[in-house]
Swiss-Prot record:
Composition-biased stretches (Basic and acidic residues): 76-90, 98-110
Biased composition (Basic residues): 297-307
Source organism superkingdom: Eukaryota
Biased composition (Polar residues): 58-75, 111-121
Cellular component, GO, one term: nucleus
Predominant place of localization: nucleus
Organism name: Mus musculus
Annotated protein name in UniProt: Transcription cofactor vestigial-like protein 1
UniProt cross-references to Pfam families, sorted A to Z: Vg_Tdu
Ranges for region Disordered: 55-121, 287-307
Family affiliation: Belongs to the vestigial family.
Swiss-Prot/TrEMBL GO biological process terms: regulation of DNA-templated transcription
Record InterPro entries: Vg_fam
Cellular compartments annotated: Nucleus
Length: 307
């Protein structure tokens, strides 16, 4: 009421007390009031709110101070109790064999002072444990199998474009410069090579790989008067006379028995037997003269192509 007097508002004594008042939570609510109530209500509520906030702030600050003091005093106690709990848990886990997975086991060869990422990297460099005898035998058998597979693969690969090879070539072309490559002499199991193949390379020397096809050939080089041996070109020169017609005397000497004994059975002959027989007979007819072979006799030509 003193504040109302200071504001200069005069109120009679009969109307100074409110008609009805309600007391609730330390605050007074005026239900009926005469005069300017707006300023009074605002001032009343502002004062009531200030009184409510102050004890809450004081209590919260005192509570936080107590917490900080308690934490400062009991800090060491909580740390020691926490470490003791961890040790107890680890000891209980190690006692139980079923709970060993929960205990972190340090890897062998790792340093405790190393960070976790370096420990992970160093674990890759640890030497592997020694393998058991069974594992060693398995690994050795696998290695041997791999080597055998490599060897078989290298042997199965065709080194030459020749079709149907009978046997591998045992002679290397690098060791001998005059060696003819195996691709020039393909071997067929059902027939013998005709001498036309060797006529392509007159300057090359015949090698032992060629004569396993012709068993009647002899690897005897020419012997010169001074004693030195010459190349095997005289055999190639004998084959050059096969392109010319034969004499009747030479054809008589070429009997079927001699042909079968020197060059194999006649069942393996190609579909053109006349030409092939003429080539075989030419091997034994090395003494025929060129003048008689070149004579234009129709009878001789007929006999040369028909037996």
């Amino acid at each position: 009421m003193e504040e109302m007097k200071k504001n200069g508002v005069w109120i009679p004594e009969s109307s100074q007390k409110p008609v009805k008042t309600e007391w609730n939570a330390g605050s007074v609510i005026f239900t009926y009031f005469e005069g300017d109530i707006n300023s009074m209500v605002d001032e009343h509520f502002s004062r009531a709110l200030r009184n409510l906030k102050r004890p809450h702030k004081c209590s919260s600050s005192s509570h936080s101070d107590n917490l900080t003091l308690k934490n400062g005093v009991n800090k060491t106690r909580t740390d020691t109790s926490h470490t003791d709990r961890e040790r107890k848990v680890e000891s209980s886990q190690t006692e139980n064999s079923g709970e060993l997975k929960d205990v972190p086991v340090e890897e062998k060869g790792t340093n405790k002072s190393m960070p976790p990422n370096q420990r992970h990297l160093s674990s890759w460099t640890i030497a592997q444990p020694a393998a058991s005898p069974e594992n060693g035998a398995r690994s050795s058998s696998l290695d041997e199998y791999g080597l055998k597979a490599m060897d078989q693969h290298s042997l199965s690969m065709p080194k030459t474009p020749s079709a149907l090879p009978l046997e591998p070539w045992h002679f290397s072309s690098l060791a001998r410069p005059g060696f003819i490559a195996p691709a020039y002499f393909p071997v067929f199991p059902d027939r013998h090579l005709t001498p036309e193949v060797y006529r392509v390379f007159p300057d090359r020397h015949l090698t032992p790989e060629v004569y396993h096809v012709f068993p009647d050939r002899h690897l005897t080089p020419e012997v010169y008067p001074d004693g030195r041996c010459g190349p095997l070109q005289h055999l190639v020169q004998q084959d050059r006379y096969q392109n010319h017609p034969l004499e009747p005397a030479a054809r008589e000497n070429c009997s079927p028995a001699k042909i079968a004994g020197s060059t194999g059975s006649l069942m393996n002959l190609p579909p053109y037997p006349v030409h092939y027989k003429k080539k075989i007979c030419a091997r034994g007819a090395a003494s025929a003269s060129l003048d008689d072979e070149r004579s234009p006799s129709p009878k001789r030509r007929r006999d040369a192509y028909y037996y």
